[in-house]
């Protein structure tokens, strides 16, 4: 569970946690709001408890929500099956139309990921055919 600004508290909303503000350090809601999150990670709102609201000096009204690390789409030259685990290594540094698959936000070099499913293929100018996978942590 965590706290999300009420205007963003809807199932499926995704966000990258950018870190806590200075005002968060002394806040009584800090443990449920920011303590469980890691800077630079992608999170998704899984459910919202509309009855639980709190006031925040930074974001205004906050709503209690179920928050989890979001699945991410990554490109790989390797052929993988559903359920396979692998260590993430960026496949390319080019600034092209597929960069969001090769260096997706929310994933860090060396992360252990698990394949949820294959989503399709892309044709990379540098590496050739790559597969796009939905992955979880």
UniProtKB/Swiss-Prot annotation:
Pfam families: UPF0179. It comes from the Archaea. Belongs to the UPF0179 family. This is UPF0179 protein Kcr_1409. It comes from Korarchaeum cryptofilum (strain OPF8).
